[in-house]
A protein has these predicted regions:
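Structural signal for short hydrophobic segments within the conserved structured cores
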Residues: 1-2, 50-52, 81-86
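A short beta-strand-turn-helix
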Residues: 1-18, 60
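Short pre-active-site segment immediately N-terminal to redox-active cysteine/selenocysteine motifs
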Residues: 16-17, 23-27, 70
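Hydrophobic beta-strand anchors of alpha/beta hydrolase catalytic cores
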Residues: 20-21, 51, 74
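The canonical Cys-X-X-Cys-His
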Residues: 28-31, 74
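Typically the conserved alpha-helix immediately C-terminal to a functionally engaged Cys/Sec
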Residues: 32-45
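Structural microenvironment flanking redox-active thiols in thiol-disulfide oxidoreductases
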Residues: 56-63
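Non-catalytic, surface beta->alpha helical segment in thiol-disulfide oxidoreductase systems
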Residues: 75-100
Length: 100
């Protein structure tokens, strides 16, 4: 699901399950590599986590607010709190492990 400024904080703070937010850009090569991996994680953990993608070109203020300096950036939230930030290409297994 693509998120925009007005929704992201409400989604994060209201969620009872873990959230993974991916910050990406269409021109980002590693982001393109991660797209199918994120889809696999989403399918495997369906109903157990929420996964959102945020295009930094459409949402530059959020990229600044969340201190996104490299792409892709993955931020994991649990109980409304940021618990982990990952940058670059990630293994599916590592993401799944962190989200369980």
């Amino acid at each position: 699901m693509e998120l925009y400024d007005e929704k992201i904080e409400n989604e994060i703070f209201a969620s009872k399950i873990p959230i993974l937010v991916e910050f990406y850009a269409d021109w980002c090569g590693p982001c393109k590599v991660m797209k199918p991996i994120i889809e696999e994680v989403k399918k495997e953990l369906e109903g157990k986590v929420k996964i959102f993608v945020l295009n930094i070109e459409s949402n530059p203020k959020l990229a600044d607010k969340f201190t996104v300096l490299s792409l892709p950036t993955f931020v994991i939230y649990q109980n409304g709190k940021r618990v982990k930030t990952l940058v670059g290409i990630q293994k599916k297994e590592d993401l799944i492990s962190l989200l369980k």
